[in-house]
Amino acid sequence: MRLRCVAPVASIVLTALLTASAGAQEVKEPRTGVSFPVSRDGMTLLGVGVRTKTFLKVKVYAAAFYVAASALAGPLAAHRGHTTAPAFYRDLVWGDFPKAIVMTFVRDTTASQIRDAFYEALPTIDHARLDLFSSHFGTPQKGQTVVVRWGPGGVIETTSVGNVKPPIADKAFAGAVFGIWLGEKPIQEDLKRDLVARAPEVLRSP
């Protein structure tokens, strides 16, 4: 079921992100207590949030979004001061530069739950492709992390609980995957906003 959450707690996340000291090495997602480093593999943290499901808002995973520092100084710099505009999100989704969604699960999952979540989020994508992608996640348990990374040319690189999976070379699919969180019809509106909450800070003029 696609979830469109209105977020009364969005201001909590924004406050947590923007009040972190300039020298902070981590940012904590306040609703789950999961912390993420502000930099990772040459990429800069743009924001953190939590994926929830059902009207009870059951927490599934804490998420962080990272973008290459070179992209922030390069093509994305044109969006300085306009980080809520659709064009900014389009460039985040489709721009061919390193970026990653990092998910730390806060509850146990099953393979069928992961698969069905992708079926729901990407209803127009071939199920065989989604079966392959979801199989790369395995069955993440509470406290385990899965990373979905955009490689050069639009290659999806998945690392599940430290295990690197075979890449999927398909730029259209890569864009669809990142659109799950950041596209025009995201799985969760407040999560979409939270994942770029640091953008005004990291894109500010020198």
Regions found by a protein language model. Give the residues of each.
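Cysteine/selenocysteine-centered motifs that mediate thiol-based redox chemistry or coordinate metal-sulfur cofactors
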Residues: 190-206
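Bacterial N-terminal signal peptides
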Residues: 8-19
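A short, compositionally biased
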Residues: 29-32, 150-154
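Flexible glycine-rich active-site/ligand-binding loops centered on an Asp-His dyad
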Residues: 165-191
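Short strand-turn-strand beta-turns centered on an Asx-Gly dipeptide
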Residues: 159-164
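Mid-length scaffold segments of soluble, non-membrane domains
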Residues: 70-151
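N-terminal secretory signal peptides that target proteins for export/translocation
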Residues: 1-5
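N-terminal secretory signal peptides
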Residues: 24-87, 93
